Amino acid sequence: MYQPEFPPVPFRLGLYPVVDSVQWIERLLDAGVRTLQLRIKDRRDEEVEADVVAAIALGRRYNARLFINDYWRLAIKHQAYGVHLGQEDLQATDLSAIRAAGLRLGVSTHDDMEIDVALAARPSYIALGHVFPTQTKQMPSAPQGLEQLARHVERLADYPTVAIGGISLARAPAVIATGVGSIAVVSAITQAADWRLATAQLLEIAGVGDE
């Protein structure tokens, strides 16, 4: 049974764009998205703090679920909705501090062993990836594909799950059909010829998430 040690999130988080700027956060909130992640990589805390503060304020204004990738100290300091961590970040992070601050926690996984590690932390949701080949970031693992994704979703039947990695508009319906509760997208929106149209179409497929 789903019993996270961190505050719970809706079972279905719906469309979950992962973006690297406050400008994209504001655009997508205005377009109706209600679950988002600010992912800025390889900068010092003091370099990203203003962006984190602005993103959190926007999330509050729209009553959205805004996760901060990696910068957990800033997320705690400015009371974000939640934090998302990769496997490589778990050991170096004070999970008890995140939990004590009342923030939700999402954790990335790439195989059964990493799912075991994530489950031990009892986060708010588990991300499953990468489903398809992706150019967004360098991945040491092979794509899982839909069959493997469906197996993981079945294993985590009582847990909020998020599929990520190479999910395009064309692939999104098949991903949702596995039963996963959310699809995280990057280039499907940010590199679309018409990002507003792409966002609207993806919202039709994945929804805005449960209340």
Swiss-Prot record:
Keywords: Magnesium, Metal-binding, Thiamine biosynthesis, Transferase. Its cofactor is Mg(2+). Gene3D superfamilies: Aldolase class I (3.20.20.70). InterPro entries: Aldolase_TIM, ThiamineP_synth_sf, ThiamineP_synth_TenI, TMP_synthase. GO terms for cellular component: cytoplasm. Its EC number is 2.5.1.3. 4-amino-2-methyl-5-(diphosphooxymethyl)pyrimidine binds at residues 37-41, 69, 108, 137. Pathway: Cofactor biosynthesis; thiamine diphosphate biosynthesis; thiamine phosphate from 4-amino-2-methyl-5-diphosphomethylpyrimidine and 4-methyl-5-(2-phosphoethyl)-thiazole: step 1/1. One of its GO terms (molecular function) is magnesium ion binding. It catalyses: 2-[(2R,5Z)-2-carboxy-4-methylthiazol-5(2H)-ylidene]ethyl phosphate + 4-amino-2-methyl-5-(diphosphooxymethyl)pyrimidine + 2 H(+) = thiamine phosphate + CO2 + diphosphate; 2-(2-carboxy-4-methylthiazol-5-yl)ethyl phosphate + 4-amino-2-methyl-5-(diphosphooxymethyl)pyrimidine + 2 H(+) = thiamine phosphate + CO2 + diphosphate; 4-methyl-5-(2-phosphooxyethyl)-thiazole + 4-amino-2-methyl-5-(diphosphooxymethyl)pyrimidine + H(+) = thiamine phosphate + diphosphate. 2-[(2R,5Z)-2-carboxy-4-methylthiazol-5(2H)-ylidene]ethyl phosphate binds at residues 134-136, 166, 186-187. GO terms for biological process: thiamine biosynthetic process; thiamine diphosphate biosynthetic process. Condenses 4-methyl-5-(beta-hydroxyethyl)thiazole monophosphate (THZ-P) and 2-methyl-4-amino-5-hydroxymethyl pyrimidine pyrophosphate (HMP-PP) to form thiamine monophosphate (TMP). CDD domains: TMP_TenI. Belongs to the thiamine-phosphate synthase family. This is Thiamine-phosphate synthase. The lineage of its organism: Bacteria, Pseudomonadati, Pseudomonadota, Gammaproteobacteria, Enterobacterales. Mg(2+) binds at residues 70, 89. Binds 1 Mg(2+) ion per subunit. It comes from Escherichia coli O1:K1 / APEC.
